[in-house]
């Protein structure tokens, strides 16, 4: 229900059957599993009563801008994906990894100010348009590209042990 509301640019969505503490986990799962929702600001507001929670949704871009950005995303992705045509599934994964590793820089500026740079560095837009992102943006882009090739995977959020900064990785599912 929340995912559908986001896709339709609804300002809010009321859900039943969830406790308030489950909403952040649900929102995080939607965020990490749907990199194409780059236009959603996952810093939401929550209104609760005894029987339901209303999630007040926020958007980074309006519908018109999202349509334009989505077309640009498709063009860039098609260019990248054309480089892995004819390869095995494993070769595609490795090639995409190498393409991202060679062409994307870690965004140290955004790392120190994630709220200010979130729309760019934590989404696929940072990688595809600016060639810079933090771990989350890079992992989401890798997932986005793999999913476009019908290779199933997920983004897993974890904490590094040395500095407790958030890091993302992806887990794939398949035969190879």
Where are these regions (language model features)?
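Generic hydrophobic secondary-structure packing signal
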Residues: 92, 131, 173-174
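Loop/turn elements at helix/coil->beta-strand transitions in domains of secreted/extracellular proteins
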Residues: 89-94, 102, 122, 147-154
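Hydrophobic/aromatic-rich core segments of domains that either
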Residues: 137-176
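N-terminal accessory/pre-domain segments preceding catalytic cores
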Residues: 1-90, 94, 98, 102-105, ...
């Amino acid at each position: 229900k929340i995912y559908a509301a986001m896709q339709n640019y609804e300002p809010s969505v009321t859900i039943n059957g969830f406790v308030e503490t489950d909403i952040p986990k649900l929102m995080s799962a939607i965020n990490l599993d749907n990199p194409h929702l780059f236009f959603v600001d996952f810093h939401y507001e929550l209104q609760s009563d005894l029987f339901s929670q209303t999630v007040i949704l926020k958007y980074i871009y309006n519908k018109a801008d999202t349509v334009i950005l989505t077309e640009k995303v498709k063009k860039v992705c098609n260019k990248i994906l054309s480089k892995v045509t004819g390869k095995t599934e494993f070769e595609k994964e490795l090639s995409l990894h190498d393409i991202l590793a060679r062409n994307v820089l870690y965004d140290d500026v955004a790392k120190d100010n994630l709220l200010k740079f979130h729309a760019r560095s934590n989404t696929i837009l940072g990688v595809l348009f600016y060639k810079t992102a933090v771990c989350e943006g890079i992992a989401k882009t890798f997932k986005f590209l793999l999913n476009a090739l019908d290779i199933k995977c997920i983004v897993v959020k974890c904490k590094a042990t040395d500095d407790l900064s958030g890091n993302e990785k992806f887990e794939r599912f398949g035969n190879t």
